[in-house]
Amino acid sequence: MKILLENPRSFCVETKRALSIVNLALKTWGKLIYVNHKIVHNNYIINNLKLKGVIFSKNINSILESSKLMLSKHSVPNKIKKTTLEKKIFIIDATCPLVKKVHKKIHYKNKNTYNVILIENSQHPKIQGTLERYQKNLKNSIYIVKSKKYAIKLTIKNTRNSIITAQITLSSEKIYPIITILRKKFPAIINSHENNICYATINRKTAIKHISKKIRHYSCH
């Protein structure tokens, strides 16, 4: 059997940072550290953290008052932060800086009466937090685009005050065909997606494509 290893692999910088934060929290306060979402898609690490005393809970109401709660790198809706204040829960914020950057951009454009076209997968935790940063009003709105089909059907009243952004971990193969359709339909629209790309995700997906070609090569010989 031939084993192929491709680079980059393992976790991104922000995932490593989140793991360091939760381990530091355990060292500082001991057991009963709550985390609102799985830090990493790795059951071995998650189970190991549970054994150390980390409690993963999406239900904010189940968290005891005056506890320690770590916000995972995916971010959380504002309503959760409000509840933590009411219950005097100490927050440890491990939100990915790139996710925060998208939140700030959407909040700023919202205040300045911009429409936002968000290319996304609405089931992802990152998006749940993002959507809450946008307050709909009579002057502007947020438009969710999940596919090329959604982009083709989309109608916007004022495209001059509109921007495109996207879930930072979506693949370029999914995003750019949608952006192409939107730019053709709405030439005045601003594409601000390039500054929000998670390059760790892109590099890993590129590596997977590269190694898949190697696998096909070896399987043919």
UniProtKB/Swiss-Prot annotation:
<feature type="binding site">
    <location>
        <position position="124"/>
    </location>
    <ligand>
        <name>isopentenyl diphosphate</name>
    </ligand>
</feature>
<dbReference type="GO" id="GO:0051745">
    <property type="term" value="F:4-hydroxy-3-methylbut-2-enyl diphosphate reductase activity"/>
</dbReference>
<feature type="binding site">
    <location>
        <position position="12"/>
    </location>
    <ligand>
        <name>[4Fe-4S] cluster</name>
    </ligand>
</feature>
<keyword id="KW-0411">Iron-sulfur</keyword>
<dbReference type="Pfam" id="PF02401">
    <property type="entry name" value="LYTB"/>
</dbReference>
<feature type="binding site">
    <location>
        <position position="124"/>
    </location>
    <ligand>
        <name>dimethylallyl diphosphate</name>
    </ligand>
</feature>
<feature type="binding site">
    <location>
        <position position="41"/>
    </location>
    <ligand>
        <name>(2E)-4-hydroxy-3-methylbut-2-enyl diphosphate</name>
    </ligand>
</feature>
<feature type="binding site">
    <location>
        <position position="74"/>
    </location>
    <ligand>
        <name>isopentenyl diphosphate</name>
    </ligand>
</feature>
<feature type="binding site">
    <location>
        <position position="198"/>
    </location>
    <ligand>
        <name>[4Fe-4S] cluster</name>
    </ligand>
</feature>
<feature type="binding site">
    <location>
        <position position="96"/>
    </location>
    <ligand>
        <name>[4Fe-4S] cluster</name>
    </ligand>
</feature>
<dbReference type="GO" id="GO:0050992">
    <property type="term" value="P:dimethylallyl diphosphate biosynthetic process"/>
</dbReference>
<feature type="binding site">
    <location>
        <position position="124"/>
    </location>
    <ligand>
        <name>(2E)-4-hydroxy-3-methylbut-2-enyl diphosphate</name>
    </ligand>
</feature>
<dbReference type="InterPro" id="IPR003451">
    <property type="entry name" value="LytB/IspH"/>
</dbReference>
<comment type="similarity">
    <text>Belongs to the IspH family.</text>
</comment>
<keyword id="KW-0479">Metal-binding</keyword>
<feature type="binding site">
    <location>
        <position position="74"/>
    </location>
    <ligand>
        <name>(2E)-4-hydroxy-3-methylbut-2-enyl diphosphate</name>
    </ligand>
</feature>
<dbReference type="GO" id="GO:0019288">
    <property type="term" value="P:isopentenyl diphosphate biosynthetic process, methylerythritol 4-phosphate pathway"/>
</dbReference>
<dbReference type="GO" id="GO:0046872">
    <property type="term" value="F:metal ion binding"/>
</dbReference>
<feature type="binding site">
    <location>
        <position position="41"/>
    </location>
    <ligand>
        <name>dimethylallyl diphosphate</name>
    </ligand>
</feature>
<feature type="binding site">
    <location>
        <position position="74"/>
    </location>
    <ligand>
        <name>dimethylallyl diphosphate</name>
    </ligand>
</feature>
<keyword id="KW-0004">4Fe-4S</keyword>
<feature type="binding site">
    <location>
        <position position="41"/>
    </location>
    <ligand>
        <name>isopentenyl diphosphate</name>
    </ligand>
</feature>
<keyword id="KW-0408">Iron</keyword>
<dbReference type="GO" id="GO:0051539">
    <property type="term" value="F:4 iron, 4 sulfur cluster binding"/>
</dbReference>
<protein>
    <recommendedName>
        <fullName>Putative 4-hydroxy-3-methylbut-2-enyl diphosphate reductase homolog</fullName>
    </recommendedName>
</protein>
